[in-house]
């Protein structure tokens, strides 16, 4: 009874998987949502529970507030709704080159001096005769050569303002920001999201993209130019599902 149920479930779930594949082929892959913690691998992540920040005790007869980083006021983002400037300066490059060469030659020769006394009689039935000293002989030669290379370079230099959307129990903050610029019929979109530490925010209320955990950075656009540069949906589907 269980086998038909499993087959029925597979049949019902197959269209859902196909729909997801079709959507990705047409619209492109989506960024993973930002959460805390975000699953970095297909397994259950175990994290130490974040501790609550220690309460700030008031200092009697003092103008200095415990935990403050400035004498008058800390102007850096620290609460939900505060704005922090994200400095994005990506200049990455990678180059890989591999080459493989292999060859192998094998020879084998075997004789049968005695074959139940029939070694002399076999020559009468075989067209070329029978030589017991070279009854079996094989030769094989294998040669394999392969090479591959990957070269990639990315450079992005942008500045975007993000909003604190959540303050975690340990004091870290979840930020997310979106910037859109429209030029004629082309819309450029820049999004950034991730988790930052208050200590990493500079006195100018800025933070570098390398200091953002679970960073999700997207730079793209949509419009007439992007539509022309994009592969048609029909062609994408054919290339996605074609076995050749």
Curated annotation (Swiss-Prot):
GO terms for cellular component: bacterial-type flagellum basal body, distal rod, L ring; cell outer membrane. One of its GO terms (molecular function) is cytoskeletal motor activity. It is found in: Cell outer membrane; Bacterial flagellum basal body. Pfam families: FlgH. It comes from the Bacteria. The keyword Transmembrane does not apply. A lipid is attached at residue 19 (S-diacylglycerol cysteine). GO terms for biological process: bacterial-type flagellum-dependent cell motility. Keywords: Bacterial flagellum, Cell outer membrane, Lipoprotein, Membrane, Palmitate, Signal. InterPro entries: Flag_Lring (IPR000527). The keyword Metal-binding does not apply. It is a lipid-anchor. A lipid is attached at residue 19 (N-palmitoyl cysteine). Residues 1-18 form the signal peptide. Belongs to the FlgH family. Assembles around the rod to form the L-ring and probably protects the motor/basal body from shearing forces during rotation. HAMAP family: FlgH. The basal body constitutes a major portion of the flagellar organelle and consists of five rings (E,L,P,S, and M) mounted on a central rod. This is Flagellar L-ring protein. It comes from Caulobacter vibrioides (strain ATCC 19089 / CIP 103742 / CB 15) (Caulobacter crescentus). The gene is flgH.
């Amino acid at each position: 009874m269980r086998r038909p149920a499993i087959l029925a479930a597979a049949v019902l779930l197959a269209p859902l998987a196909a729909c997801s594949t079709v959507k990705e082929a047409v619209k492109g892959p989506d960024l993973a949502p930002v959460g805390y913690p975000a699953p970095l691998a297909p397994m259950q992540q175990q994290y130490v529970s974040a501790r609550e920040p220690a309460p700030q005790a008031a200092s009697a007869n003092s103008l200095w507030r415990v935990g403050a980083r400035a004498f008058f006021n800390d102007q850096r983002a620290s609460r939900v709704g505060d704005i922090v400037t994200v400095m994005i300066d990506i200049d990455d490059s990678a180059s890989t080159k591999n080459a493989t060469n292999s060859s192998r030659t094998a020879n084998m020769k075997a004789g049968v001096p005695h074959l139940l006394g029939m070694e002399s009689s076999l020559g009468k039935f075989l067209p070329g005769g029978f030589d017991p000293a070279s009854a079996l002989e094989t030769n094989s030669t294998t040669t394999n050569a392969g090479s591959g290379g990957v070269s990639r370079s990315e450079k992005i230099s942008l500045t975007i303002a993000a909003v604190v959307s959540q303050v975690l129990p340990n004091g870290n903050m979840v930020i997310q920001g979106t910037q859109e610029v429209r030029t004629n019929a082309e819309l450029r979109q820049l999004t950034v999201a991730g988790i930052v530490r208050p200590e990493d925010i500079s006195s100018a209320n800025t933070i570098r993209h390398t200091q953002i955990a679970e960073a999700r950075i997207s730079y793209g656009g949509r419009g007439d130019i992007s539509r022309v540069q994009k592969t048609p949906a029909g062609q994408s589907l054919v290339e996605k599902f074609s076995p050749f």
